[in-house]
Amino acid sequence: MRPEDLQDLSLLGQKSVPYIFEYTPDVLEAFPNRHPENDYFVKFNAPEFTSLCPITNQPDFATIYISYIPDEKLVESKSLKLYLFSFRNHGDFHENCINVIGKDLVKLMEPRYLEVWGKFTPRGGISIDPYYNYGKPGTKYEKMAEHRLFNHDLYPETVDNR
């Protein structure tokens, strides 16, 4: 990695990093993709995502799956972790959390393709699994996003195989 690729990363390597538990997209950081000529997926699994129900103020728990095909930038993983932590005391519905995460990542990276899938644990006997995706307009990734959305989760799992 070239030193100039790291100059905008302020969180990685810091021993005392403040953990912010209110929604804070400003904590997200990106670095240059050194292989923009390649199409490849980057995937993150965040099994300890927590937010609050905006009505009851009760905690909601989820595993968040983020997959993207980068263009010129990649998200720095520690900043992503801190960003996801920032939802801890944020009151919002599951569907909105996933859409906000997706839109914030698109704004940060301008990826070729991105998807965010939240698999929330059941509350009141129902689990909610919102899915967001994005394909760069005017490219093959826009069609890819449409195809993946239309074919997403055709075979939903049962409660015992979550």
From Swiss-Prot:
Coiled-coil stretches: none
Major subcellular location class: cytoplasm
Enzyme Commission code(s) on record: 1.7.1.13
Keyword line: Cytoplasm, NADP, Oxidoreductase, Queuosine biosynthesis
Pfam families assigned to the protein according to its UniProt record, in alphabetical order: QueF
Active site annotation, chain numbering: C53, D60
GO biological process: queuosine biosynthetic process; tRNA modification
GO molecular function, one term: preQ1 synthase activity
Family, as annotated: Belongs to the GTP cyclohydrolase I family. QueF type 1 subfamily.
Descriptive protein name: NADPH-dependent 7-cyano-7-deazaguanine reductase
